[in-house]
Amino acid sequence: MLHVSASKGMTEYFKNILDDVSNLYNLAEECRKNGYDVTDHVEIPLAKDMADRVEGIVGPKNVAERIRELVSEFGKEPAALEIAKEIVEGKFGEFGREVGAEQAVRTALAVITEGIVAAPLEGIAYVKIKKNSDNSEYLAIYFAGPIRSAGGTAQALAVLVGDYVRKNMGLDRFKPTEDEVERYGEEVDLYQSEVTTFQYQPKAEEIRVAVRNISVEITGEATDDVEVSGHRDLPRVETNQIRGGALLALVEGVLLKAPKILRHVDKLNIEGWNWLKELKSKKEEVIEELEEENDEYNYEDEEDLSQYEDYEVEAVTKFIGEVIAGRPVFSHPSKKGGFRLRYGRSRNTGFATDGFHPAIMYLVDDFMAVGTQLKTERPGKATCVVPVDSIEGPIVKLNDGSVLKIDTVEKAKQYTDEVQEILFLGDILVNYGDFLENNHTVLPSSWCTEWYEKILKSQNLEYTEEFIKNPGQKEAVNYAKITKTPLHPKYTYFWHDISKENISTLRSWVIGGKYNPSNDSWELNYDPEDEEISNAKRYLELIGCPHIVMEEKVEIFEYYPFLYSLGYDFDEKRDMIDNIDEKLQNTKNNMHFINTIAPFEIRRNAYIYVGARMGRPEKAAARKMKPPVNGLFPIGNAGALVRLINKAVDEGKTDEIEIANVKCSCGKVSLYRTCPFCGNSVEPTGPSRIKLPIKDYWYKTLENLKINKPGDVKCIKGMTSKDKIIEPLEKAILRAKNNIYVFKDGTTRFDCTDVPVTHFKPVEIHVPIEKLKSLGYLKDIHGNPLENEDQVLELKVQDVIVPESCMDYFLNVSGFIDDLLEKYYKKDRFYNVNTREDLVGHLIIGMAPHTSAGMVGRIIGYSNANVGYAHPYFHASKRRNCDGDEDAFFLLLDAFMNFSKRFLPDKRGGQMDAPLVLTTILDPKEVDGEVHNMDSMWEYPLEFYEKSLEGIAPKEIKKMMETIEDRLDKDSQYEGIGYTHETSKIDEGPPICAYKTLGSMMEKTSAQLAVAKKIRATDERDVAEKVIQSHFVPDLIGNLRAFSRQGVRCKCGAKYRRMPLKGVCRKCGSRLILTVSKGAVEKYMNVSQTMAEKYDASDYIKQRLEIIKSGIDSLFVNDKRKQVKIEDFFK
């Protein structure tokens, strides 16, 4: 029986996945029983839910059922505390006091993080019971760097759990000395200056208050080489180095998440945390209304002018504080002409991914491809670019002065080379759920067709769908006049972007024109030398009114609504306003003025412009270690720098390697559990250094595989795991044969950017309809039988659409697994695939780097975009949102057959990014809670748009909005999720981000600034200065410092912090090489100075670059020596 609520169809879907998982698991078990692998069983336990994952990752044994009971009864956080209490009480076995406390904290943290992230394993080093100066005992939690993967809230709750455990163990509170209190403050400052900045910069007094009041010691391992200089050698602090994990738990946990902790404290009735109320909570963004203009108004009509208030929001500049070279700024904060905020969700947006018109993706010189990350002004910190062509596209000015709306990709490609200026970037489609998740004020909506249609519906007016989408000019004007409704959004221009005086100037020029029947346009005389006409022409551009410039004439084709908006009756060819100067004087602002002279209501087109800059480019590439290798078979330095085992064999080289081994009864050294030379079962013992018989293993492996001449096979130098147990060489050779690479845990992976999709068309994923039917896709979203490739289907929650390149790579991986089955395990081939379509329906694992739990998925097709499409639930099951991060896919059978915990590095963080447990069925309740805020409506209500004008908190309107949270524990949690905006093609747009195709840094920065130059909402001089200050200068200074502190290395792999006295490698006698080259130090010097001059950077920046250059020259340039005579000194 399934443990989730689902319809009959979804139940059948899950049953098929479970059956396929079971079949693959059994096949892998049969293979492993042969004794050719590290263990005789599959090392990835299957988990049906969060409780199974927790028990599988951190234990203790038999805890899963109790977790289910507690979560069902109390909820996640209370259950975590109760399970911690029961562990220290000995209900799951007798532990020592410290061991029990550590187990309790780990298990509770695992419950809080849904048993997915690695933090409970790797983020907590250990827990100790220590003594205060008065000899009382207290609890100390030692945090490590990977605690970051838990997120701020979970980090804070880990401390809360520690306090709860302390109380239940009868321990006293932590009583810090003044030196210990001040030590935290010193470490926080040092961490931010030498390592990296925190999300939240706490004041010194906040740190003191927190440390004095938190009842457990937040401490940890040394994570960075930087040492404190003041509060050193403290008896209870084991290191003088920075404790990064402890600082994360304190600053980004307790201090940053103080409001959330207080909510949990109040809810759970935990005492001792009221001091948090004294700390200042983070400031929320609020809408600030501009003060009224100083003009004198005449309010004789006593009309309500509140609708004409000027709106401004406080610009959020944090996203643009750092600009990376080669990655363009598309819009400065809240700058006119930037991305216009529009509410809604398309089938490929939501969950931190925003929609953009595909035309703008081409017009910014291909710097926006599907999956490209943008750092955004609001509502969150970042988003992912995806195409939505049903929203407003960009408006551009061409070289000849014409202004066009670019509403198709074809137009964008046609006019790209002719664009002089991008006047308006188009819409950014953001769903309500992202505002709810970020607790960001719901800002005023732009004037859009969906809002307009809601108004018409509310008044029971008749209209057609075609009228809403694309009304004729006269039709729109007449409809507005007759029905007393606002003018259609299509003909509503950006009047608010120019002043009322500018509108008046524009009006005077426009009314002086005439109708041109041959072109069906309104024709204006245009003389660019005439200042007044030139200004009026600019105002025409700024309001976004399309027009063509031809032979000293300006032709306006949308003349009918445009003229009426300016108070000119086209039909009667007369000015409807007699006293324009009086109207100008007596109106409050631009929108009041335009509404006074127009015969209908004109809404404000845009309230909010959103700033954005490029973050990371999209990614779709095979996961490779550095350097890439085919297998986890160590050969030391025998393969030279290229690490080729073929080379070692051909040259007869070997090396001494620390490795698990045993001498077999046949007299040979066996590195495996089955001796490759005689077939006896043996058990390699703990690692020891031996001269590896590389040649013997090479030829024996080729004989076993019946391969004569394999290609190049790259191997590792040595194992970093605890037991140094290795992978059979056969696997490395077969991977090389199939041109694939191995990761640290024995799996073969493909990384790609996470992008959400809830619905798709068969044509988008290159899969025949009959194949989709066999996978359970029988009807489209309207309930019609699936018959053609353009129907829209709802994606099943564990199905994924991989990139085309991933499909090709997995063809190679499947070939490797089939070869492994046939040649090594002597089994029948399993996949037998020849085409991409053959892989459709096969199972994969999806996994994020910061986690230790995988999620089973099923391939249903591939796209042309370099991203991994999956249901938002699927991404959330990996504890990810979709703001530009990348995760991995790998074939399920590959993981079952080749993964081993015993390959994992024996160091902090070594167990991250490894499938220590595998979730088979996706339960929406047990995924990252962010996805629960995603809205699932087919349309937003009229009240939403009206409330948005008030700048309301998102929680205050939640009742009128349906989100995923409202569907949990119902059959509808998996099906029937809606979206508000259609898109023609989910992978429309440039195939690859321009950043990845450009060569040198000079090319990248030139392209970056060329984009900035043509975007109205961007200041290229400011971009150039920010690139120099935030990227080039820190890099130059850092590399200069690194050069002066560098060590040396040898080609044999030996590294020295300082040059040995002999001047050569002590290991092999070879010449030593510098680790930081001259080129690395000065690589950005020329491009920085060129940019500073070209874009007239400030004198401060130019002088700073000169100082850095003189520092570099002092290292690498000899001072010129001039021969002088003694009499020269007497001149």
UniProtKB/Swiss-Prot annotation:
The keyword Cell cycle does not apply. The keyword Hydrolase applies. Its EC number is 2.7.7.7, 3.1.11.1. GO terms for biological process: DNA catabolic process; DNA-templated DNA replication. Signal peptide: none annotated. It catalyses: DNA(n) + a 2'-deoxyribonucleoside 5'-triphosphate = DNA(n+1) + diphosphate; Exonucleolytic cleavage in the 3'- to 5'-direction to yield nucleoside 5'-phosphates. InterPro entries: PolC_DP2, PolC_DP2_cat_dom, PolC_DP2_central_dom, PolC_DP2_N. Keywords: DNA replication, DNA-binding, DNA-directed DNA polymerase, Exonuclease, Hydrolase, Multifunctional enzyme, Nuclease, Nucleotidyltransferase, Transferase. One of its GO terms (molecular function) is single-stranded DNA 3'-5' DNA exonuclease activity. NCBIfam families: polC, PRK04023.1. Possesses two activities: a DNA synthesis (polymerase) and an exonucleolytic activity that degrades single-stranded DNA in the 3'- to 5'-direction. Has a template-primer preference which is characteristic of a replicative DNA polymerase. Belongs to the archaeal DNA polymerase II family. Heterodimer of a large subunit and a small subunit. HAMAP family: DNApol_II_L_arch. This is DNA polymerase II large subunit.
